[in-house]
């Protein structure tokens, strides 16, 4: 087999974010190396915090100080200021724009490339104040490719929540100028992975993946079969617990806690079951139309006038024009068809601004775009 790192670099996905996305895939160390998280037992006993807490401190059976690992152990955020802390982690070049790659053979000895993506927070950002579900600390998603005997991709499988979707390599959209690079359209807030841009009906909600955000070629952190040890740590990457909401979920286990870690073919089976179940889904309702917006600059703020019939909430996102930064977002409830909201910009640069409306059911619209001129 060709060196795993070479194969993983050759076919690493280009992550195409939604225009309103606030959380980008980064090193798993964004969850251990900063002072905002704690490793603790299920009863709340704190075991470690940074700088003692690090990826190297984690293991399948014992921690770096010799204490035993328990399956109920959790790394959780202390302040819940997810936006600020994720932004601080992303600002550090050592941590931002990473995927964790692994070459693994399945139970039929077919070779797969797995790309595990870690996100600081899972936030559907449908309308913030309207929905209490669909949000959790930590988010592991993945893309995997099956290679043939000549080590060329033949099948791609993308995770989508608890489901997955599979396509032959010939039907996968590639990056311009590179037939080796699959495009992965990342859904707003949920980070589900799609083969095409647009609004995707899951049977319960819409995932919006408009593909109008930054396009990132991440660096690959190479993983082995059961190494580094943090990858098979059995604890929880976040302390969020699901409620009765149909869009809610627990924080996830790490890569080694997923069945496809041991046998990549199992995810292809999930994709087959997902396709079969899709026929029984209820018909997709009409998604709300995007708001009509007009933006003016008032010093270090953007004033957004909107017209959004029947909207109950509005999400507004800004990033410096032309940058590859995650968006900064605010979510506000609204009443009436028309109104204004203000967004802090922070400096004199030009900004791109995107706005999405949500209806009373929490379904979010596609984004409307505008440019805030420099001051």
Language-model segments: residues:
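Beta-strand signatures of extracellular beta-sandwich domains
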Residues: 315-319
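Aromatic sugar-binding surface patches on proteins
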Residues: 335-341
């Amino acid at each position: 087999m060709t060196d795993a790192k070479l194969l993983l670099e050759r076919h690493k996905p280009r992550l195409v974010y939604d225009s309103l996305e606030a959380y980008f895939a980064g090193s798993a160390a964004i969850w251990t190396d900063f002072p905002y998280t704690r490793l603790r037992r299920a009863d709340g006993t704190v075991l470690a915090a940074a700088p003692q807490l690090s990826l190297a401190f984690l293991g399948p059976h014992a921690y770096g100080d010799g204490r035993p690992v328990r399956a109920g152990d959790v790394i959780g955020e202390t302040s819940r200021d997810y936006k600020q802390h994720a932004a601080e982690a992303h600002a550090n070049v050592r941590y931002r724009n990473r995927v964790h790659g692994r070459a693994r053979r399945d139970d039929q000895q077919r070779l797969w490339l797995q790309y595990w993506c870690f996100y600081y927070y899972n936030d559907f950002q449908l309308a913030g104040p309207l929905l209490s579900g669909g949000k959790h600390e930590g988010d592991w998603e993945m893309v995997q490719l099956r290679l043939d005997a000549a080590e060329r991709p033949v099948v791609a499988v993308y995770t989508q929540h608890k489901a997955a979707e599979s396509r032959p390599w010939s039907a996968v959209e590639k990056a311009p100028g590179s037939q080796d690079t699959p495009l992965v359209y990342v859904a707003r807030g949920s980070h589900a992975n799609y083969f095409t841009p647009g609004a995707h009906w899951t049977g319960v909600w819409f995932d919006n993946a408009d593909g109008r955000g930054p396009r990132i070629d991440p660096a690959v952190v190479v993983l082995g079969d059961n190494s580094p040890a943090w990858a098979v740590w059995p604890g929880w990457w976040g302390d969020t617990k699901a409620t009765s909401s149909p869009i809610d979920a627990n924080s996830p286990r790490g890569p080694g806690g997923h069945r496809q870690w041991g046998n990549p073919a199992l995810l292809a089976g999930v994709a087959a079951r997902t396709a079969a179940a899709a026929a029984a889904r209820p018909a997709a309702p009409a998604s709300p139309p995007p708001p009509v917006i007009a933006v003016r600059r008032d010093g270090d703020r953007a004033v957004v006038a909107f017209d959004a019939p029947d909207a109950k909430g509005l999400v507004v996102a800004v990033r410096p024009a032309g940058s590859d930064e995650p968006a900064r977002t605010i979510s506000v409830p609204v009443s009436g068809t028309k109104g204004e909201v203000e967004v802090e910009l922070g400096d004199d640069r030009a900004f791109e601004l995107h706005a999405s409306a949500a209806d009373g059911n929490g379904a979010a619209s596609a984004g409307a775009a505008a440019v805030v001129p420099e001051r």
